[in-house]
């Protein structure tokens, strides 16, 4: 198990060696814990279909919530058009813990959408920092929804982000395939070395192989892995400057406080979770706030506190339990988690700056807590009370595949959410099995170690949070479908002439194909707003194309019926 967290002064890792489970204390007594109640998600419709899944805004209760929502009104109006329905404004009490958020979701939320499942919004844009709408609230909503969060240091950030999303949505897309980029900071530490070998390399290899052999399953224009042997922030900045829709998966330590003193609250909000480049410094908020950095792209940022810092860590009590049962090397990590932020938590300065940048990414996925290796390398207690690992890099391959294919960011996260559901079920089975035997955590230290590591996996997966509008997707043009030669070119088939404009042959064939596919999709029941967003054109254009296509088709069918009647009349 590896931790991606480094000191802010010298870039050295806080934990740079693997704990040895073989030294587990034989006499340690497990402390009973209560299992969490889980929720079942009912996923019945196409997850990226905004008209069916609905989109809503979640803000803190009171005047502050209304003020925050007013800052993104252009985006709210656009989403209302996309889903062909009014946007629901959801106000929640600030500071709710998990129990309060669960009770609110069960007792209050259904009345807001009329208690009709077809009207329940799943795409939920949360406005405000963690002290305004709590992290617990976001995680409870994520049990069967697709939440994303926007939080900025100034009001201007909200407007700038909304303008950026709408600009990419309305600008005609120039590329129909995305880049899949992988980047590792090779700082020589154990965690990044292992992360490169066990996540970046396997995931890159699988993406590259699928692109080569089954391009339709992973439609990327490039699958590239980067990271110089000597870390250099400028290398990443140059790589991310290209104005080409891209998904970036990066592996690095997240920046923590210096060894000799704690950060002030203001310093923590600006620097904690910045991308550590070891002795070469860090990629911080000031570095990504004004230069092109993954414009129109999506960033999976794998680092401690990369997305933010919670009020209290979800790991501390489990780290203490593992240390009690022999994994004493985890002590330094646990010590860093005492009173992370008494103010309620905060979104990282790096993510805020990147999202507020007009030439920055549309969304950032990262940890609001420590980032461990559990999500890509699951650890289990073996027969000899040693830890065995299984590579889970395919979790991230599945996520990147959905993003590259143009799925909405919130829907793509189902790839990780479903894994979390499996772990939750396993935890419930664990508690039920041992409760039958008269214990809760198990009778032996090995049982406690197994439970502790399973909970670490659960918390690691649960710690991922999406920053940005969950409805964003890579701005890609729909690829032109392959066209086959007509089965009958004898000239006997009816002809349809459209008035106005020059000869169809003078038109761009790809654009014509895209409009045809849009018209067919709308005829099949798809929302014009959804299709327009996918193509990057105004809704009015696809609606007009659908009408013209329908009218022309009906005219051709009418001519066909008329000709059939004439031929029938001439028959002997």
Put a short name on every predicted segment:
Residues 79-80, 110-132, 207-348, 359, ...:
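Catalytic-core segments of thiol-dependent peptidases
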Residues 509-526:
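Short, amphipathic alpha-helical "recognition" segments used to contact nucleic acids or chromatin
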Residues 531-533:
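Short alpha-helical "recognition helix" segments of helix-turn-helix
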Residues 550-570:
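Short Lys/Arg-enriched helix C-cap and helix-to-coil transition segments
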């Amino acid at each position: 198990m590896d931790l991606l967290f480094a000191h802010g002064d010298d870039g050295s890792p806080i934990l740079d060696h693997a704990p040895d489970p073989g030294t587990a204390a034989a006499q340690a007594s497990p402390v009973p814990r209560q299992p969490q109640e889980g929720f079942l998600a009912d996923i019945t419709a196409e997850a990226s279909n905004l008209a069916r899944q609905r989109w809503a805004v979640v803000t803190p209760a009171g005047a502050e919530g209304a003020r925050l929502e007013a800052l993104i009104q252009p985006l709210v109006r656009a989403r209302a058009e996309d889903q062909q329905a009014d946007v629901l404004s959801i106000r929640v009490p600030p500071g709710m813990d998990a129990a309060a958020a669960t009770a609110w979701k069960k007792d209050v939320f259904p009345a807001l959408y009329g208690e009709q499942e077809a009207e329940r919004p799943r795409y939920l844009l949360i406005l405000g920092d963690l002290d305004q709408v709590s992290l617990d609230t976001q995680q409870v909503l994520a049990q069967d929804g697709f939440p994303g969060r926007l939080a900025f240091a100034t009001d201007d950030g909200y407007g700038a982000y909304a303008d950026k999303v709408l600009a990419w949505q309305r600008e005609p897309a120039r590329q129909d395939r995305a880049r899949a980029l992988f980047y590792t900071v090779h700082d020589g530490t154990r965690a990044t070395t292992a992360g490169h070998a066990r996540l970046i390399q396997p995931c890159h290899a699988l993406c590259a192989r699928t692109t080569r052999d089954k391009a339709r399953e992973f439609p990327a224009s490039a699958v590239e892995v980067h990271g110089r042997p000597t870390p250099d922030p400028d290398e990443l900045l140059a790589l991310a400057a290209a104005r080409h829709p891209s998904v970036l998966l990066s592996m690095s330590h997240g920046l923590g406080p210096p060894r000799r003193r704690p950060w002030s609250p203001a310093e923590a909000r600006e620097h904690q979770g910045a991308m550590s480049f070891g002795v070469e410094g860090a990629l911080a908020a000031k570095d990504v706030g004004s230069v092109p950095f993954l414009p129109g792209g999506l960033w999976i940022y794998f680092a401690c506190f990369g997305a933010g810092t919670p009020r209290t860590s979800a790991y501390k009590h489990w780290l203490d339990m593992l240390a009690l049962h022999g994994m004493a090397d985890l002590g330094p990590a646990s010590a860093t988690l005492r009173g992370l932020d008494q103010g309620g938590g905060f979104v990282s300065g790096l993510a805020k700056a990147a999202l507020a940048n007009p030439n920055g990414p549309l969304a950032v996925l990262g940890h609001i807590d420590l980032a461990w290796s559990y999500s890509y390398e699951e650890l289990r207690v073996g027969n000899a009370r040693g830890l065995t690992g299984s590579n889970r890099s395919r979790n991230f391959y599945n996520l990147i595949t959905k993003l590259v294919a143009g799925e909405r960011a919130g829907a793509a996260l189902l790839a990780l959410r479903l894994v979390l559901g499996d772990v939750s079920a396993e935890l419930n089975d664990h508690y039920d099995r041992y409760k039958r035997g008269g214990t809760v955590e198990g009778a032996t230290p090995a049982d406690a170690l197994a439970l502790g590591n399973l909970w670490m996996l659960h918390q690691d997966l649960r710690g991922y949070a999406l920053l940005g509008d969950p409805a964003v997707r890579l701005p890609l043009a729909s690829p032109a479908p392959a066209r086959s030669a007509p089965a009958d070119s004898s000239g006997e088939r009816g002809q349809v002439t459209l008035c106005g404009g020059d000869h169809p042959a003078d038109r761009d064939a790809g654009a014509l194909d895209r409009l045809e596919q849009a018209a067919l999709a709308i005829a099949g029941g798809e929302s014009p707003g959804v299709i327009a967003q996918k193509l990057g054109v105004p809704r009015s254009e696809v609606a007009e194309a659908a009408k013209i296509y329908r009218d022309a088709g009906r005219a051709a069918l009418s001519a066909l019926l008329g000709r059939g009647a004439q031929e029938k009349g001439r028959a002997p």
